[in-house]
Regions:
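Classical eukaryotic N-terminal signal peptides for Sec-dependent ER targeting/secretion
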Residues: 1-17, 23-25
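Alpha-helical adaptor scaffolds
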Residues: 517-518, 526-552, 556
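Alpha-solenoid HEAT/ARM repeat scaffold
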Residues: 373, 404-407, 438-442, 487-491, ...
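Long internal repeat-built scaffold domains in very large eukaryotic proteins
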Residues: 324-325, 329-359, 369, 385, ...
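Helix-rich alpha-solenoid scaffolding regions
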Residues: 363-457, 464-470
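Signature of exported/secreted
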Residues: 17-336, 373-377, 397, 408
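Short inter-helical turns and helix N-cap capping residues of alpha-solenoid HEAT/ARM repeat scaffolds
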Residues: 367-370, 399-403, 436-437, 485-486, ...
Length: 912
């Protein structure tokens, strides 16, 4: 909620416009007023102060750092135009410049004093510069050669203060800020306010990098306003204030801010005899060059930007040294922790600034053998020309021993939101080669499709869209060539279609969903659900209706429940809800699918109030609100629980467990963020099993014999993972009864065993904020996720019980900086967020006489640590000021309730 001061500031220009709208001055009057200012033959001396302060976000109360430049500004109109008073040639001369910073003796903001510092500002040329001023606009500057871009941009900032209008009006102005909309409001006879917004950045700035998903961009709030005071012939006082604040979407206090204040105040007026007599402006400039014996360069007010990264200063950290310093952070034991995510950012930065030879040297160094797969993670995160070339020259796609390194590189690359098209094409070429294993072929093709889809979404050019479309066609062709009984081949390309998310694939997926076998139909239906409501047209909903109610043929229960989930998330009508509830009350269906369908109805009602009201109406009108329909007896569950609700972000844990024979047939735990009514899928961890029919007689006491295909399927269990919308190939734990019993007798899973590990980049943000004073603020943010999903299971055939735990551990580090880098001084604010998300799923089962199954989902206690560091370096001086503030915010854990039957089972087991 905005503060009262924020609301007052926002309403102030509007209030002025309302008060003054009764007597507006026409534009011609404004031109006449401004035309009488700065008559020829008079010199005006101003006291000039330009202040720049940088600090943390507004929620961070620590003192800011900053500097200011003070001096005297001489202004004179040296050309009395004969044709119109609207044209002037202003001479601007900045004299006696001084750089000032805060005194170290000052301990707080109230009493802080600026003091003079020795600096390179003494090297500024003592030459005037000239502005072509026309009716309140600076058309061009005429400047002699300067010693630095800092000086040149500073002069443009000074000249920008002389852009003004003296009546109520809207104008478009070009300045150091770019092309901006400016609103002028007359406060009284001699004061005009100025409000600047809607700026389009100058084309002279480098390209920016912004994630297509708003939640990963963060928020930049800007405000620019000024005052112009004048008398009958000159400006008396001009000020222009601006404030910019960036914060991450996750925590307002993690970010940085910069403020700038330009101020000139008239101190003295004296005669000026240096007047040029010329008939035209061009002739006046020519005479001026002769008189000063200088060559004047014509410029506009756009900033000239110089990239001042570590390469500019020849100070880049050497990759081998950075890897050595953060070696222990990248060990397997640190995965899933914030320590590895923090170190990963440092290593990725070093990789980006390294050549191919240097990267290969680090990869082949024996000292890095224990972190080699993590290094390939980071090469995939960096994903530039050099890192990709080094990876391709050190990875052997024909060697089965390289599978882990290859997959880790490809998984990390597939999540990168801004891949290069050249890299995608190079990987695409490898897909047609003879590869070492089906795992590599699966991962490689899915990586290419995921990267192409992300590129087309991020950079919506014809070339990128064409590549994505070509891959859709290629994937469909490969899918068509798969044998009907080759599920592995079919599923590989269905996963590729899920990564591409293209409407062209809908028809094929619907066909597999309705006519495929139990495995392919469920995957096809799940892929359609992943596409989201944007692609669920009437045709999709029609197929879902047929599949759920089995109007064409008998369908797999997983396929049916996914189809029902799509229907219920598509604003269902009265008739659909009526038919679903009637189906719940009808006999003949296996009760676990009914339990799951009931859970879906409850979840729909929790998430959508309109659908909830409609469901209540159906239950009352159709007299269906009774035990037979609304009180099923199964263990299946489907629910979502909030684990965070902060800063307009809602974090949800979504759990889905479809039970068959007392065992999870298909389940998933999803982590979802909601921001500004948009959902972002962070991670989905799924599990599937078949053929564990041994438990049926213990679980189902109804006496009915299972006649479905489920009972005759081989014993299988596997895991599947979706990270940031990218489908990773599944991991098969066992695929036969023999393998299962081998694990049981050997106790394979009794120790904690990694399922999937890796480090990937989730945030990359580069933004430039030009200031009115001529300085450009550079905002750079990176975020890494270190993931470790591990499992452990213990089973006793003697005691007939089992315990298992699956841990999803994610370490997150977000590091950013706001830098104001000039030849005089560098001000920098570094901010970071460090945290860990630990989500554990516990299961306890007893199956001596009857199955008792207790499942718990636990969000473990954790901390969120924020760090803000501020530093200032005056170039040419040895000292550098530096302050750091660290805060830790505890986050309480919680255990999420499932359904009533599971709770009763938990009470039974834990009471013994």
């Amino acid at each position: 909620m905005a503060s009262s001061s924020d609301r007052t500031a926002a309403a102030y220009p509007l209030l002025l416009l309302l008060l003054l709208s009764s007597s507006p001055l026409p534009c011609s009057a404004s031109a006449a007023d401004s035309g009488r200012l700065f008559p020829a033959g008079v010199q005006y001396e101003y006291e000039s102060t330009t202040t720049v302060l940088a600090g943390g976000s507004s929620d961070n109360r620590d003192p800011a750092i900053g500097h200011r430049v003070v001096g005297r500004l001489l202004v004179a109109n040296i050309w009395p135009a004969t044709d119109t008073a609207g044209d002037k040639l202003l001479m601007l001369h900045f004299k006696s410049p001084k750089l000032q910073t805060w005194s170290k003796k000052s301990k707080n903001d109230v009493n802080r004093q600026f003091i003079d510092r020795k600096s390179r500002i003494d090297r500024f040329s003592d030459q005037p510069f000239f502005a072509h001023w026309r009716n309140g606009h600076i058309e061009n500057l005429y400047v002699s050669s300067t010693n630095s871009l800092t000086e040149e941009n500073f002069k443009k900032g000074i000249a920008g203060l002389f852009q003004f209008q003296l009546s109520n009006q809207h104008a478009v102005e070009y300045s150091t800020l770019g092309e901006c909309n400016v609103t002028y409001s007359k406060i009284n006879q001699n004061i005009v306010s100025k409000l600047v917004d809607g700026c389009v950045l100058p084309t002279t700035l480098p390209p920016e990098i912004k994630h297509p998903d708003k939640i990963w961009q963060g928020t930049l709030r800007s405000k620019r306003e000024g005052l112009v005071k004048y008398n009958h012939e000159s400006l008396v006082d001009v000020s222009l204030d601006e404030y910019h604040e960036f914060s991450t979407s996750f925590m307002n206090e993690v970010g940085a801010s910069v403020s700038s204040k330009q101020h000139i105040e008239l101190k003295e007026t004296k005669p000026n005899d240096d007047v040029i007599k010329a008939n035209t402006f061009k002739e006046a400039i020519h005479q001026l060059e002769k008189q000063l014996k200088l060559k004047l360069e014509k410029q506009n007010l756009s900033l000239k930007h110089e990239v001042k990264n570590c390469k500019h200063y020849n100070s880049c950290n050497k990759l081998d040294e950075v890897v050595y310093n953060y070696h222990d952070s990248l060990l397997d034991s640190e995965l899933g922790k914030s320590k590895s995510a923090y170190g990963a950012i440092k290593v990725v930065d070093a990789i980006v600034n390294s050549d191919t030879k240097t990267i290969k040297k680090v990869l082949t160094d024996e000292k890095n053998e224990d972190i080699i797969v993590q290094l390939y993670d980071l090469l995939g995160a960096a994903l530039n020309e050099n890192s990709h070339k080094a990876s391709m020259e050190t990875l052997d796609f024909t060697n089965a021993k390289s599978v882990e390194k290859i997959e880790r590189y490809l998984w990390s690359a597939s999540i990168n939101f801004n891949p290069k098209i050249e890299i995608i094409k190079s990987l695409l070429a490898i897909t047609d080669e003879n590869l070492a294993s089906k795992k590599i072929a699966d991962t490689l093709f899915n990586t290419v499709t995921a990267m192409a889809s992300r590129l087309a979404r991020y950079n919506h050019t014809d070339t990128n869209i064409l590549l994505s479309g070509e891959l859709v066609v290629k994937t469909l062709e490969k899918l068509e060539k798969c044998k009907l009984d080759d599920d592995e081949c079919i599923l590989t390309y269905i996963r590729a279609l899920s990564n591409l998310k293209h409407p062209l694939s809908i028809e094929v997926l619907l066909s597999f969903a309705q006519h495929g076998n139990r495995k392919t139909s469920a995957y096809a239906m799940k892929t359609i659900k992943m596409f989201g409501p944007g692609l669920w047209d009437s045709r999709v909903l029609k197929y879902c209706n047929r599949i759920f109610f089995q109007l064409v043929k008998e369908q797999d229960s997983s396929t049916r429940t996914i189809a029902l989930a799509i229907l219920l998330e598509s604003n269902p009508d009265y008739d659909l809800l009526k038919h679903v509830v009637e189906w719940l009350a009808a006999p003949g269906e296996e009760y676990e699918i009914k339990q799951y369908a009931l859970e879906l109805l409850k979840e729909m009602a929790n998430q959508n109030e309109t659908s909830a009201r409609l469901l209540r109406t159906v239950l009352v009108r159709e007299r269906l609100n009774h035990y037979g329909s609304m009180a099923q007896r199964g263990l299946s569950s489907c629910f979502s629980r909030k684990f965070i609700n902060y800063n307009n972000i809602t974090g949800l844990v979504k759990n889905s467990q479809q039970i068959y024979s007392g065992v999870t047939k298909r389940g998933s735990v999803d982590i979802v963020l909601e921001h500004d009514s948009v959902k972002y899928d962070l991670c989905s961890f799924g599990m599937f099993t078949t053929g564990l029919g041994y438990f049926t007689s213990l679980y189902d006491d109804s006496g009915k014999k299972d006649t479905s295909d489920e009972a005759n399927l081989p014993a299988t269990a596997g895991l599947e993972l979706i990270v940031f919308g990218v489908h990773i190939r599944p991991f098969i734990m066992f695929s036969s009864q023999g393998q299962l019993m081998g694990h049981v007798w050997a106790g394979t899973g009794s120790d904690k065993t990694p399922i999937i590990q890796g480090i990937s980049q989730m945030i990359e943000h580069l933004e430039y904020v030009p200031l009115s004073n001529g300085i450009t603020a550079e905002l750079n943010v990176k975020g890494m996720l270190s993931l470790d999903i591990s499992g452990q299971i213990e089973m006793s055939l003697w005691n007939k019980n089992a315990q298992s735990v699956i841990e999803k551990n994610g370490g997150v580090s977000i590091q950013g900086s706001l830098k104001l880098d000039t030849d005089l001084v560098t001000d920098e604010v570094d901010f970071s967020l460090i945290t860990e998300g630990l989500l554990h799923m516990h299961s306890d089962a007893e199956f001596a006489t009857k199955i008792v199954l207790c499942m718990r989902i636990v969000f473990v206690d954790t901390n969120v640590t924020t760090i803000v560091s501020k530093s200032e370096k005056v170039h040419g001086l040895p000292h550098k000021s530096h302050t750091t503030t660290t805060r830790t915010h505890p986050v309480s854990g919680r255990t999420f309730a499932l359904n009533q039957m599971v709770n009763e089972f938990c009470n039974t087991i834990h009471s013994r």
